[in-house]
Amino acid sequence: TDERKQELSNHYASVVSRITAARARRYAKTGVDTPVTLLGASKTMPAEDIAFLMRDCGLRVAGENRAQEFAAKYDDVIAAGGEYHFIGHLQTNKVKTLIGRAALIHSVDSVHLAQEIGRQSLAAGVTTRVLGEVNSGCEASKSGVAPADARAFFAEIAAIPGIELAGMM
């Protein structure tokens, strides 16, 4: 509906305004202007809403936290002209759903998962960009490696064919 589109547009503009103000404050304080990429989490949102934000409001990157939802929304999001990232916990049996589709997988929390992503990527003839997940608070309820193990974890992931380690989460 037009009302829903206006609501989405207003909310998006508000978020962009807050980001712009925060960047300006940081620049005034430090003299450093750091680029920011806004990722719209599409959790529970219909594909039409994400497509509208991309097509009409300027959102460039969306992220989904469930592999099945990612697959269901993929065509609409890509048709709107944006990047689609996977931002949730990923099980090895769901990897195939994302290969060749996800511009970036944010949540690689084990070497075993990275190896499966690499294997599936090679089979599809693509390279998959990933972020290694660090559990900075060492919380049992969170995924990722302990900070003390991060360097070795990243080195191991970076050596896996079919994967490009793009950073950490």
Describe each region flagged by the PLM.
Residues 1-169:
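Conserved alpha/beta-domain cores
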